[in-house]
Amino acid sequence: MAKLRVGIIFGGQSAEHEVSLQSAKNIVETIDENKFEVVLFGIDKEGQWHINNKLNYLIYGENETYIALNKSNKHIAIIPGRKHDQFIQIDMLEQLVQLDVIFPIVHGTLGEDGNLQGLLRMANLPFVGSTVLGSAVSMDKDIAKRLLRDADLEVTPSITLTRINRENFSYDQIITYLGSSLFVKPANQGSSVGVSKVINRISFDQALALAFCFDDKVLVESAINGRELECAVLGNHDPQASLCGEIVLSDNFYSYEKKYLNEHGAVVVVPAAISKEVSNNIQKIAVRAFQALNCTGMARVDVFLTTNNKVLVNEVNTSPGFTSISMYPKLWQASGISYPALITRLIELAIERYYAEQKKISHRDIYNKIDTGSA
């Protein structure tokens, strides 16, 4: 049986560029080479695309602090709408390899917010993860909360501020509604980029200034007194939930540094030490959240478990990390799906969704096949 050619897209222009490099490195090292041939596409911080060699696509690949994309490789462009040969080498105008499926592992803005997904959809390529809509609404924490509330799911209490309306809410008004212990975060960032813990007016002003550096929309949320749990979801029309995992913090904030740079910043417990009843409830909520946001393929659902066992949905991440310490693959490993098998299943789901979409008839076909009753 011929191998499927998988294009792994990584890097990107967001603040999570280095996290994406780590994720790509793990996927490349773990993917089943008996089934798949890997083609590497690195996006540098200026937004240029490079086709990379598996032997030298990273610089300082073993150093999580200094890891970087090798930008000396060929620049490429993508041609939307073609059935095959969508990628060309810019300087030679040569068509590159034909791909069977794309595994995008670009985190953050322009990577998991629907932009890259739209480009791949226009290029007529199957790709792993959610479609344009699911990616976009999940990335925007404000929109995601609205949809989750509409689906009768409880979320962390919050107020959304923009550059236009920020003066309409005073600090005193906000703490009256949300309490004095707060988190401030950009609406469209991940990996805790731009997130601050707030305990007073001074730290609130500083947190807002930082968050608005990353986005034009900012969420101010109540700091929840509870446990931070995560559940992985996998599937398309019949999604399944993994066992739950818990983030046990050395203090009360799971920052970017604790997630990726400080191995002592947090302890990941998989499976979480919770009752079967609570675990089942979180799994059901995770699947409902996945479906409410129109997700497909994969997502990691982050929740808070309060002292009275109330479950509050915090975030839904449609492009979870695949680094050596990332929760998504760990949760599935604990649930009986190995890392290579997980990658294989995600690729299968991408192709499954692609061919299901190809079967949809066009609007012209509808009018040809349906008698509208018009004269």
Curated annotation (Swiss-Prot):
It comes from the Bacteria. Its EC number is 6.3.2.4. The keyword ATP-binding applies. It is found in: Cytoplasm. Binds 2 magnesium or manganese ions per subunit. Pathway: Cell wall biogenesis; peptidoglycan biosynthesis. It is an enzyme of class 6 (ligase). GO terms for cellular component: cytosol. ATP binds at residues 175-230. Mg(2+) 1 binds at D302, E315. InterPro entries: ATP-grasp, ATP_grasp_subdomain_1, D-Ala_lig_Van_CS, D_ala_D_ala, Dala_Dala_lig_C, Dala_Dala_lig_N, PreATP-grasp_dom_sf. This is D-alanine--D-alanine ligase. Keywords: ATP-binding, Cell shape, Cell wall biogenesis/degradation, Cytoplasm, Ligase, Magnesium, Manganese, Metal-binding, Nucleotide-binding, Peptidoglycan synthesis. GO terms for biological process: cell wall organization; peptidoglycan biosynthetic process; regulation of cell shape. Cell wall formation. Its cofactor is Mg(2+); Mn(2+). It catalyses: 2 D-alanine + ATP = D-alanyl-D-alanine + ADP + phosphate + H(+).
